[in-house]
């Protein structure tokens, strides 16, 4: 069944049909298409545009189509001759309920229909991704709560910098993924206006009640410009941008896990169930899942750039180029959902080697800043203290020892301000625990933050 053809004298070339059809991929939102159609005919009947009997017959037919598609009793084949999911649903409906099915499209264009379907689908997927992000945040919070006193080195430039805790490190990613949830929420708020009733681009002469249709579909209200309604893909660009940032956060985290999982670091061990082996090297246990998640970020970025490039030269209103949005959005959404699901499972099954982390934190002079602060607290200007401790570090490097092991007399040779209590000041636990400002790794600060995170997840 075609939704057009009266003014044509030739059949569509098969290659043209194959190139033009979208049923092979837009069948993904058949539920949203049916939901939108049910709302549309409900409004049409309320406005007296359709008879009550036509409404009943159409809704009965649409519900039977969804039931059969859900159960597998009805399948969608790209070879069926239908151009897209809209024509498939309308054609199948007409086969089932007869003449009434031909009235389904009254007061509607595929342009506003597909805009609605994509918004409904995007809204549903945002809800699902929000749940996946929440699951990940719950797992990160559990790791934080269990590791308030698991010391590890913090890094800058991949060089050891200062001692922190595993809880503090996980908290950084908690913040990132919390922002990701917030971005998805913002997108949903901005896009939650109903385009149905905009027609092809100029509305319709039928007395539609667009506000009623919007209410039936849980939108805040109707969109206010019919041309923008059918030509707008900003919400998809925003979504792809947000998904790209999620993918970037996952990629950064995976990069750290890959590094931590090496024999050189040994901070973590990825569970066997989330690892793979080598076809030639029997000893290998590879972090393939982390590497794949890291790699798939480029795929998501590509979708964003592709859609931006598609949209940049399009005049108003609808253009067929916009059909390209679906495969890009579908793939990016599925990719990020899969990555979130796998990443959460990988984190939940991962072993954190606390003893290795703590031993590493004791090396590399991570307490040097605290030695400088010790001097500052005794009246030495920070810039002078910085230079003094730099000399201490150089002395320790020459002797192959840590600051903790340098004799007091050698401290005092460089600065007489040092006293016996310097060793307590630069002890790793002291270095971490005295950092109590908001956002710092000390237990007092971390407990307050964790309480806020827990409250955030319970809302």
Question: Where do the PLM segments sit?
Answer:
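Conserved helix-loop functional segments at active or binding sites
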Residues: 146, 183-186, 190, 219-223, ...
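Glycine-rich cofactor/substrate-binding loops
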Residues: 1-36, 99-100, 281-459
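Short, contiguous, pocket-lining structural segments
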Residues: 132, 158, 162-172, 176, ...
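Acidic, glycine-rich loop-and-beta core segments that form the ion-binding/anion-interacting portion
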Residues: 217-309
């Amino acid at each position: 069944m075609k939704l057009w053809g009266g003014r044509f004298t030739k059949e569509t070339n098969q290659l043209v049909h194959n190139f033009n059809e979208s049923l092979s991929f837009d069948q993904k939102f058949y539920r949203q298409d049916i939901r939108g159609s049910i709302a549309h005919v409900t409004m049409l009947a309320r406005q007296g545009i359709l008879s009550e009997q036509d409404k009943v017959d159409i809704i009965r037919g649409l519900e039977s189509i969804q039931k059969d598609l859900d159960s597998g009793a009805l399948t969608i084949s790209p070879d069926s001759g239908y151009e897209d999911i809209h024509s498939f649903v309308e054609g199948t409906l007409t086969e089932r309920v007869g003449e009434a099915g031909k009235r389904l499209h009254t007061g509607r264009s595929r342009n506003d229909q597909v805009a609605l379907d994509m918004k409904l689908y995007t809204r549903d997927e945002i809800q699902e991704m929000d749940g996946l992000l929440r699951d990940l945040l719950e797992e990160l919070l559990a790791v934080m709560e269990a590791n308030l006193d698991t010391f590890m080195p913090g890094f800058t430039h991949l060089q050891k910098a200062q001692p922190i805790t595993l809880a503090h490190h996980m908290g950084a990613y908690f913040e990132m993924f919390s922002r990701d949830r917030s971005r998805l929420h913002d997108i949903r708020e901005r896009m939650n206006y109903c385009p149905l009733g905009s027609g092809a681009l100029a509305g319709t002469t039928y007395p539609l009640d667009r506000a009623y249709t919007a209410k039936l579909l849980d939108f805040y209200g109707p969109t206010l410009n019919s041309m923008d309604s059918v030509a707008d893909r900003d919400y998809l660009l925003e979504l792809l941008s947000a998904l790209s940032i999620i993918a970037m956060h996952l990629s950064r985290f995976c990069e750290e896990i890959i590094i931590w999982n090496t024999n050189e670091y040994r901070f973590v061990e990825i569970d066997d169930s989330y690892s793979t082996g080598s076809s030639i090297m029997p000893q290998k246990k590879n972090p393939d899942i982390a590497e794949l998640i890291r790699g798939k970020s480029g795929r998501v970025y590509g979708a964003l750039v592709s859609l931006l490039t598609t949209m940049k030269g399009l005049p108003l209103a609808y253009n067929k180029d916009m059909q390209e949005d679906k495969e890009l959005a579908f793939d990016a959404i599925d990719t990020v959902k899969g990555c979130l699901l796998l990443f959460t499972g990988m984190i939940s099954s991962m072993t954190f080697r606390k003893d290795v982390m703590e031993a590493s934190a004791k090396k590399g002079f991570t307490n040097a800043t605290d030695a400088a602060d010790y001097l500052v607290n005794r009246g030495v200007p920070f810039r002078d203290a910085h230079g003094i401790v730099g000399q201490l570090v150089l002395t320790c490097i020459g002797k192959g020892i840590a600051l903790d092991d340098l004799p007091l007399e050698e401290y005092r040779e460089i600065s007489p301000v040092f006293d016996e209590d310097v060793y307590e000041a630069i002890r790793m636990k002291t270095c971490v625990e005295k950092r109590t400002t908001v956002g710092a790794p000390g237990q007092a600060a971390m407990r307050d933050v964790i309480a806020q995170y827990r409250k955030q997840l319970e809302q």
